[in-house]
Amino acid sequence: CIETVVMRYHYGNTVCVSTQVGCRMGCRFCASTQAGRVRNLEAGEICSEIYTAQKDIGERISHIVLMGIGEPLDNFDEVMRFLENISSPEGVNIGMRNISLSTCGLVPKIDQLAEKKLQLTLSVSLHAPNNEIRSGMMPVNDAYPVEVLMPAVRRYQETTGRRVSFEYSMVRGVNDSDACARQLADLIRGMGAHVNLIPINPVDGSPYSATDAA
Protein backbone atom coordinates (compact mmCIF):
# COMPACT_ATOMS: atom_id res chain seq x y z
CA CYS A 1 0.00 0.00 0.00
CA ILE A 2 0.95 3.66 -0.26
CA GLU A 3 -0.12 6.82 1.51
CA THR A 4 -1.18 10.23 0.22
CA VAL A 5 -1.75 13.03 2.72
CA VAL A 6 -3.43 16.41 2.15
CA MET A 7 -2.41 19.28 4.41
CA ARG A 8 -4.35 22.54 4.41
CA TYR A 9 -2.46 25.77 5.05
CA HIS A 10 -3.37 29.44 4.78
CA TYR A 11 -1.40 29.69 1.53
CA GLY A 12 -3.01 26.66 -0.15
CA ASN A 13 -3.29 22.89 -0.13
CA THR A 14 -0.20 20.69 0.04
CA VAL A 15 -0.23 17.00 -0.84
CA CYS A 16 2.42 14.55 0.33
CA VAL A 17 2.84 11.78 -2.22
CA SER A 18 4.45 8.34 -2.23
CA THR A 19 6.85 7.31 -4.98
CA GLN A 20 7.27 3.60 -4.21
CA VAL A 21 5.32 0.76 -2.67
CA GLY A 22 7.51 0.19 0.36
CA CYS A 23 11.14 1.26 0.58
CA ARG A 24 14.49 -0.51 0.60
CA MET A 25 16.55 2.17 2.35
CA GLY A 26 16.17 0.54 5.77
CA CYS A 27 16.07 3.66 7.97
CA ARG A 28 15.60 2.27 11.44
CA PHE A 29 13.04 4.84 12.59
CA CYS A 30 10.74 4.48 9.56
CA ALA A 31 7.72 2.18 9.41
CA SER A 32 7.42 2.20 5.61
CA THR A 33 10.75 0.42 5.10
CA GLN A 34 10.08 -2.55 7.39
CA ALA A 35 8.73 -4.78 4.61
CA GLY A 36 11.24 -3.57 2.01
CA ARG A 37 10.42 -2.26 -1.44
CA VAL A 38 7.65 -4.01 -3.35
CA ARG A 39 7.89 -1.94 -6.55
CA ASN A 40 8.34 1.53 -7.98
CA LEU A 41 5.32 3.64 -8.78
CA GLU A 42 4.96 4.77 -12.38
CA ALA A 43 4.73 8.48 -13.18
CA GLY A 44 1.02 8.17 -13.94
CA GLU A 45 0.37 6.50 -10.61
CA ILE A 46 2.11 9.32 -8.75
CA CYS A 47 0.11 11.86 -10.77
CA SER A 48 -3.08 10.02 -9.83
CA GLU A 49 -2.34 10.76 -6.17
CA ILE A 50 -2.61 14.47 -6.98
CA TYR A 51 -5.76 14.12 -9.07
CA THR A 52 -7.43 11.91 -6.44
CA ALA A 53 -6.57 14.36 -3.67
CA GLN A 54 -8.03 17.29 -5.64
CA LYS A 55 -11.19 15.31 -6.34
CA ASP A 56 -11.60 14.25 -2.71
CA ILE A 57 -11.29 17.75 -1.23
CA GLY A 58 -12.88 19.61 -4.12
CA GLU A 59 -10.08 22.16 -4.15
CA ARG A 60 -6.91 22.78 -6.11
CA ILE A 61 -3.60 21.40 -4.89
CA SER A 62 -1.00 24.19 -4.87
CA HIS A 63 2.06 22.49 -3.38
CA ILE A 64 3.59 19.00 -3.54
CA VAL A 65 6.05 17.28 -1.23
CA LEU A 66 7.56 13.97 -2.29
CA MET A 67 7.91 12.72 1.26
CA GLY A 68 5.49 9.80 1.45
CA ILE A 69 6.41 6.14 1.21
CA GLY A 70 9.55 5.41 -0.80
CA GLU A 71 12.84 7.10 -1.67
CA PRO A 72 12.10 9.40 -4.64
CA LEU A 73 15.64 9.27 -6.04
CA ASP A 74 15.53 5.45 -5.98
CA ASN A 75 12.77 5.78 -8.59
CA PHE A 76 14.54 8.55 -10.48
CA ASP A 77 13.22 8.20 -14.04
CA GLU A 78 9.55 7.87 -13.10
CA VAL A 79 9.79 10.72 -10.59
CA MET A 80 11.32 12.96 -13.28
CA ARG A 81 8.45 12.07 -15.63
CA PHE A 82 5.99 12.83 -12.85
CA LEU A 83 7.56 16.25 -12.24
CA GLU A 84 7.47 17.07 -15.94
CA ASN A 85 3.82 16.05 -16.23
CA ILE A 86 2.51 17.65 -13.06
CA SER A 87 4.23 21.00 -13.70
CA SER A 88 3.07 21.33 -17.30
CA PRO A 89 0.10 23.54 -18.30
CA GLU A 90 -1.60 20.38 -19.56
CA GLY A 91 -1.21 18.82 -16.10
CA VAL A 92 -1.91 20.48 -12.76
CA ASN A 93 0.48 23.33 -13.66
CA ILE A 94 2.19 23.41 -10.28
CA GLY A 95 5.40 25.43 -10.44
CA MET A 96 8.64 23.71 -9.48
CA ARG A 97 9.21 26.23 -6.70
CA ASN A 98 6.11 24.79 -5.02
CA ILE A 99 7.51 21.25 -5.06
CA SER A 100 9.84 19.68 -2.48
CA LEU A 101 11.66 16.40 -2.99
CA SER A 102 13.06 14.45 -0.06
CA THR A 103 16.03 12.09 -0.16
CA CYS A 104 17.91 10.04 2.41
CA GLY A 105 21.12 10.90 0.58
CA LEU A 106 21.73 8.96 -2.66
CA VAL A 107 24.70 11.04 -3.75
CA PRO A 108 24.94 10.00 -7.44
CA LYS A 109 21.25 10.78 -7.87
CA ILE A 110 21.59 14.14 -6.11
CA ASP A 111 24.28 15.04 -8.65
CA GLN A 112 22.07 13.78 -11.48
CA LEU A 113 19.17 15.86 -10.19
CA ALA A 114 21.40 18.93 -9.95
CA GLU A 115 22.27 18.61 -13.63
CA LYS A 116 18.60 19.11 -14.49
CA LYS A 117 18.61 22.51 -12.71
CA LEU A 118 15.01 22.18 -11.60
CA GLN A 119 13.77 24.92 -9.30
CA LEU A 120 12.29 22.55 -6.74
CA THR A 121 13.43 22.38 -3.11
CA LEU A 122 15.72 19.51 -2.17
CA SER A 123 15.01 18.23 1.32
CA VAL A 124 17.75 16.04 2.78
CA SER A 125 16.86 13.56 5.52
CA LEU A 126 19.95 14.12 7.63
CA HIS A 127 18.88 13.20 11.18
CA ALA A 128 22.43 13.16 12.57
CA PRO A 129 25.53 15.37 12.23
CA ASN A 130 28.16 12.62 12.24
CA ASN A 131 28.76 9.17 10.77
CA GLU A 132 28.62 7.23 14.02
CA ILE A 133 25.08 8.30 14.83
CA ARG A 134 23.80 8.53 11.26
CA SER A 135 25.00 5.05 10.27
CA GLY A 136 23.22 3.67 13.33
CA MET A 137 19.97 5.29 12.18
CA MET A 138 20.34 5.11 8.40
CA PRO A 139 22.19 2.30 6.59
CA VAL A 140 22.53 4.51 3.49
CA ASN A 141 25.18 6.44 5.40
CA ASP A 142 27.56 3.49 5.08
CA ALA A 143 27.51 3.98 1.30
CA TYR A 144 27.36 7.78 1.31
CA PRO A 145 28.79 9.08 4.60
CA VAL A 146 28.40 12.64 5.80
CA GLU A 147 31.70 13.78 4.26
CA VAL A 148 30.44 12.56 0.86
CA LEU A 149 26.83 13.65 1.23
CA MET A 150 27.39 17.24 2.30
CA PRO A 151 29.63 18.24 -0.64
CA ALA A 152 26.97 16.80 -2.97
CA VAL A 153 24.30 18.92 -1.29
CA ARG A 154 26.50 22.00 -1.60
CA ARG A 155 27.07 21.20 -5.29
CA TYR A 156 23.33 20.93 -5.75
CA GLN A 157 22.80 24.31 -4.12
CA GLU A 158 25.53 25.96 -6.15
CA THR A 159 24.23 24.50 -9.42
CA THR A 160 20.54 25.29 -8.90
CA GLY A 161 20.75 28.41 -6.75
CA ARG A 162 18.02 26.94 -4.55
CA ARG A 163 17.92 26.78 -0.78
CA VAL A 164 18.19 23.28 0.66
CA SER A 165 16.24 21.95 3.62
CA PHE A 166 17.49 19.41 6.14
CA GLU A 167 15.11 17.12 8.00
CA TYR A 168 16.28 16.26 11.51
CA SER A 169 14.14 13.90 13.62
CA MET A 170 14.88 14.43 17.29
CA VAL A 171 15.54 11.13 19.10
CA ARG A 172 15.90 11.10 22.86
CA GLY A 173 19.45 10.33 23.94
CA VAL A 174 20.68 9.70 20.39
CA ASN A 175 20.97 12.90 18.34
CA ASP A 176 19.60 15.59 20.64
CA SER A 177 22.66 16.61 22.65
CA ASP A 178 24.25 20.05 22.73
CA ALA A 179 27.29 18.52 21.04
CA CYS A 180 25.09 17.30 18.17
CA ALA A 181 23.59 20.78 17.82
CA ARG A 182 27.05 22.32 17.55
CA GLN A 183 28.18 19.70 15.02
CA LEU A 184 25.05 20.32 12.95
CA ALA A 185 25.70 24.07 12.96
CA ASP A 186 29.27 23.50 11.80
CA LEU A 187 28.09 21.09 9.11
CA ILE A 188 25.72 23.51 7.40
CA ARG A 189 27.54 26.77 8.12
CA GLY A 190 27.45 29.16 5.18
CA MET A 191 24.74 27.28 3.30
CA GLY A 192 21.72 29.43 4.12
CA ALA A 193 19.83 26.19 4.65
CA HIS A 194 16.60 25.53 6.49
CA VAL A 195 16.62 22.92 9.28
CA ASN A 196 13.35 21.25 10.19
CA LEU A 197 13.50 19.78 13.71
CA ILE A 198 10.91 17.00 14.01
CA PRO A 199 9.83 15.05 17.12
CA ILE A 200 10.20 11.46 15.97
CA ASN A 201 7.03 9.36 15.82
CA PRO A 202 7.06 6.04 17.69
CA VAL A 203 7.22 2.99 15.40
CA ASP A 204 6.58 -0.62 16.41
CA GLY A 205 9.88 -2.48 16.57
CA SER A 206 11.95 0.69 16.79
CA PRO A 207 13.90 1.54 19.97
CA TYR A 208 13.66 5.28 19.32
CA SER A 209 11.50 7.76 21.21
CA ALA A 210 11.01 11.49 20.78
CA THR A 211 13.00 14.15 22.58
CA ASP A 212 10.98 15.89 25.29
CA ALA A 213 9.60 19.29 24.31
CA ALA A 214 11.82 22.19 25.37
Question: Residue locations for each model-derived region?
Answer:
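Conserved AdoMet/S-adenosylmethionine-binding subsite of the radical SAM
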Residues: Q54-H63, G68-A213
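Conserved alpha-helical substructure of the radical SAM core
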Residues: Q34-H63
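Short beta-strand motif preference
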Residues: T4, V15-V17, L122-V124
